[in-house]
């Protein structure tokens, strides 16, 4: 009887150990699965952040290139406008010069006219 109780006790202990070992393995498997799921979830976020960062870097590079082109084009436009402004000033200078010459020519023509008329009047008398 004692031997039978000992065997039963040992059998129950073995069953408990096996059940406990099974639960421990199940807990380890569940913890591993949870850890993998958390890592995968975090990796998705990190991967998305990396992709977004690459897109932003590309956009920044494109924007810098376009800004440089715009600055160059703006400089060219400013140069053209300054050249045009200078040409307009020169045209204005030529116009003023032409008016001055025209005024001088009228004065000379008037003086010559008076001289011519002055020469005609004494000889006609």
Swiss-Prot record:
Name the EC number(s).
2.3.1.-
The chain's coiled-coil residues are: 1-25
**What is a GO molecular function of this protein?**
protein-lysine-acetyltransferase activity
Q: Which GO terms describe its biological process?
A: aerobic respiration; anterograde axonal transport; anterograde synaptic vesicle transport; lysosome localization; neuron projection development; peptidyl-lysine acetylation
Sorted keywords for this record are: Coiled coil, Cytoplasm, Lysosome, Membrane, Mitochondrion, Transferase
Q: Which Pfam families match?
A: GCN5L1 (PF06320)
Q: In the UniProt record, does the keyword Cytoplasm occur?
A: yes
State the similarity comment: Belongs to the BLOC1S1 family.
Please state what the protein is called. Answer: Biogenesis of lysosome-related organelles complex 1 subunit 1
């Amino acid at each position: 009887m004692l031997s039978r109780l000992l065997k039963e006790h040992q059998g129950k202990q073995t069953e408990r150990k096996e059940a406990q070992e099974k639960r421990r393995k199940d807990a380890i498997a569940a913890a591993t699965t949870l850890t993998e799921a958390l890592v995968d979830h975090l990796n998705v976020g990190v991967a998305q952040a990396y992709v977004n960062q690459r897109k932003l870097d590309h956009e920044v590079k494109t924007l810098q290139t376009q800004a440089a082109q715009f600055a160059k084009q703006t400089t060219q436009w400013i140069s053209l406008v300054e050249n045009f402004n200078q040409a307009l000033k020169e045209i204005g200078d030529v116009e003023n010069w032409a008016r001055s010459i025209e005024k001088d020519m009228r004065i000379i023509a008037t003086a010559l006219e008076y001289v011519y008329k002055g020469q005609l009047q004494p000889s006609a008398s």
